[in-house]
Design a protein with these regions (language model features):
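Flexible, acidic/Gly-rich N-terminal and inter-domain linker regions that tether
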Residues: 1-99
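Conserved Radical SAM active-site core
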Residues: 89-91, 96, 101-107, 111-179
Length: 179
């Protein structure tokens, strides 16, 4: 199964017998870049067998949502990350000084602002909610991320449903405060 949205992940977990607490745990560990085996209690004590057995595959699918293709460090402590998506498209995320991350919400852009290179090729597609969260998880494998800004490739307001779903997850189980 390929995940695109956070809702897809929840639906798949429910189909395996997960309840909201199980979903919460899987999504929390993924969005915080922690292994699915981490936790105070052993999985056997509370996670349904079907979910436990599927976890390695689920974890692999979640990690495949966003992969690092290139990293370019900046002199100011920032780092540009070229992020590969499942379908072969790429977006950029930028690790910012002081625990921030700038994420992309579209592959390309339809606006075409004269100062921005992103719009020159036009809009290719929307970045799905799970792919937005995956950019955060990928960055957290490199260093702590406590703040997220939606100022990368694309116009967040033109992809509002996916952006809001990602914000909801990051602001709850993702341990990033809403401001």
């Amino acid at each position: 199964m390929s995940y695109w949205s956070v809702s897809d992940i929840r639906t798949h977990l429910r189909a395996l017998g997960a309840n909201p607490k199980h979903e919460h745990r899987v999504l929390r560990l993924w969005s915080q870049a922690l292994p699915q085996t981490q936790g105070r209690r052993p999985l056997e004590s509370f996670m349904p067998a079907a979910v436990r057995e599927a976890l390695p595959g689920i974890e692999a699918q979640l990690q495949a949502l966003a992969t690092l293709r290139e990293q370019h460090p900046g002199e100011d402590g920032s780092a540009r990350l070229l992020v590969g998506l499942q379908d072969g498209q790429s977006v950029e995320s930028v690790l910012l000084p002081r625990d921030g991350l700038c994420v992309s919400t579209q592959v390309g852009c339809a606006v075409g602002c004269v100062f921005c290179m992103t719009g020159q090729g036009g809009l290719v597609r929307q970045v799905e909610s799970a792919e937005i969260v995956a950019q955060v998880a990928l960055a957290r494998h490199r260093r702590p991320v406590k703040k997220v800004v939606f100022m990368g490739m694309g116009e967040p307001a033109h992809n509002l449903d996916n952006v809001l779903e990602a914000i909801d997850l990051l602001g709850t189980v993702g341990n990033i405060g809403h401001k």
